[in-house]
Amino acid sequence: MTSLPIILASSPLRNLTKPCSTSQIPKPIQNSTKQPPIHLLTKTNLSVTISQLIITSPVLASESFDSISSDPSSGKIDLESILVTIDNFFNKYPFFVAGCTFTYLVVYPAVMFYLRKYKPISAMNAFRKLKNESDSQLLDIRDVKTLALLASPNLKFLGKSSVQVPFSENDEEGFLTKVKGSFSDAENTVVCVLDNFDGNSSKVAELLIKNGFKEAYYIRGGARGKNGWLAIQEELLPPPVHMYTAKNVKSSNNNEASVVGTEN
């Protein structure tokens, strides 16, 4: 039978109670790389998670790409998407687009032309207006040399007279002063403007409206142009309002003199 001291000496409890030397204490394993701070790891993991979520979700991905393409801070415009949108709108509403185009190109100019107070007028309609409207007058804006070769229409037959004021683009104020001096009541006067053709007459008609005249019409073709006063007077206008050239005046005077001589 083994004695008690021998048993205690060989017991593991005795070995545990012995203090360990410092050389026998195991050292912790040290990593060769340093660990980053915990808050950096948190931010990195969060950003990676969000990016993965966007990529895996088709709805969020499309919204993100749309926001990038339409981001005003980038300073870029997606012309292709704009053109596609316009094309889709035209294809979806063709009648609306056609109506807007017709209104802009046809209706609007026609309404503006009708509402404005200076308009073109044919020589025949100008004669009718001078005949039927008491407040209408004829303004001849041709220069002095032209008036010497081709006189203004004689309106004594209508109880009126042609007003002759040569127009000069370099002296519009002086021209307006003379015209207003020739018509006592400009606000109630309708003026038919006659030129050699119809180049300056439209400018004068617009100028008169801007300066207080009731209405102003510029005669199409003027005195010498196509369908002008000279062109229609033989067929459509009565002889008292005809325009005569210097040759016609001389020939008419010679004919009268010859008639008087034969009678004597």
UniProtKB/Swiss-Prot annotation:
Recorded topology in the membrane: Single-pass membrane protein
Residue intervals passing through the bilayer: 95-115
Annotated Gene Ontology cellular component terms: chloroplast; chloroplast thylakoid membrane
Keywords carried by this UniProt record: Chloroplast, Membrane, Plastid, Transit peptide, Transmembrane, Transmembrane helix
Transit peptide location: 1-60
Location relative to the cell: Plastid, Chloroplast; Membrane
Gene3D superfamilies in UniProt: Rhodanese-like domain
InterPro entries: Rhodanese-like_dom_sf, STR4-like
Record domain Rhodanese: where: 132-232
Keyword Chaperone: no
PANTHER family: RHODANESE-LIKE DOMAIN-CONTAINING PROTEIN 4, CHLOROPLASTIC (PTHR47377), RHODANESE-LIKE DOMAIN-CONTAINING PROTEIN 4A, CHLOROPLASTIC (PTHR47377:SF3)
Name of this chain's protein: Rhodanese-like domain-containing protein 4A, chloroplastic
Gene from which the chain derives: STR4A
